[in-house]
């Protein structure tokens, strides 16, 4: 045991045993600093300090902000980052396509004759590369990009076939989201999870579209329903995607002045915004069902409003096959010609009479099923995009169609002018999707080996004139043309079992008669003279229409005979225009 005196002597001995005193901290610091190499002793520039702080501090601050944010704010922060990625991908695709066309037309094909096989082969390959790039970019970006890609399919007489064939894959392809996102959206809109609202809910989507995906579910009363769930980030990214597309279209216009489609995007802004409102879609569906109620074969799924919101739409589940799936249609024992006739009549009723027009009737939105009477029923889906055509425009359109059949140039010019179009012949051909003047066709095109497919050549050679006509039209007419063209394409896919030209023309005149009757009701009354006048006009039109149809069929048969005799080259596109 140490005593206090012994401890003091021990510590004193330790202190006196050191030869040198302990250096002070200041001396130690100065000695080490002086020993550093010169390059490390120079002061750090201010800009480097700021940059280092920003590089290290900014991610830390953003990360902390993200961790502390609520779920909805986290999603918006992710959207900013994802938006930069979408912009980069879109810019890459736009530049790739533009430079590819520039290289082909100005370098590879310089001095090559435009209609030569080599020219057509190179351009076809260029078109295919561009279409593949568009599809890949649209699928990667999703949402609005897929929707616009689907819209391009309807321009199948303005765009090369490589585009329309390739872009059709977008009708059924879109991004699919996980169950966590579905749960998050239901909690935001209903403050409940899907399994709390429904007796059964399948998180695996049965279909995925450009704006939403569809889930199978069952209500508590056992009713099978389809639940359309919007992608949760679409509303937040809508404005950014629109601005990106506007920028890219302007860039393309600078490089290719004749390709001026930015005005189309401007006009579609409002309609696309409407499609994001599923409550509006539900109201559209109910109005469509009311206005087509006199067609017993048209089915519109009933909306369940207590399970719907602006981002969720619940409606009756209706099974069926696509309207262009000929094998599935025949396997049900249904007649293809019956389906084609019903399809044309239903949409012609909207165009020429009600004016409330389904603007996206692609095959994925029209299903076919067997009804109680054993005949086909048409199930109309996706009522988000509708266009209303004013009565004066409907009347002008009906009378223009009638004037085309009667070959009344003065009336054609007058009614086209009422729609704001000056080049009435070109507009008539765009509207009818077939040549208007058979004499002109026969004299200058049918016997020409270079221009056998008249309508295809018209679209390519007069691209700027076609664009001018589209700009002159009332904006609702753009979606009307899309409807007409889509229905025509479905009729072709079914093998053109009915005369679309004949059915549309009859509906146009009937629509004009009903509109005129509503306008002058109480003025002319039901006098015998007025009735006789209506009967005479209808009879005159019926005769002219049947003669026109017969002339078209004879022309197509004669063209095929000339091809068989090797007097003219094959032109399947021409036959389709003459027969469908």
Curated annotation (Swiss-Prot):
GO terms for molecular function: protein serine/threonine kinase activity. The keyword Lipid metabolism does not apply. It comes from the Eukaryota. Its EC number is 2.7.11.-. InterPro entries: ABC1_dom (IPR004147), ADCK1_dom (IPR045307), Kinase-like_dom_sf (IPR011009), Mito_struct-func_regulator (IPR051130). It is a single-pass membrane protein. The keyword S-adenosyl-L-methionine does not apply. Residues 179-419 form the Protein kinase domain. It is found in: Membrane. One of its GO terms (cellular component) is mitochondrion. The chain crosses the membrane at residues 50-67. Keywords: Kinase, Membrane, Serine/threonine-protein kinase, Transferase, Transmembrane, Transmembrane helix. The function of this protein is not yet clear. It is not known if it has protein kinase activity and what type of substrate it would phosphorylate (Ser, Thr or Tyr). Belongs to the protein kinase superfamily. ADCK protein kinase family. This is Uncharacterized aarF domain-containing protein kinase 5. The lineage of its organism: Eukaryota, Metazoa, Chordata, Craniata, Vertebrata.
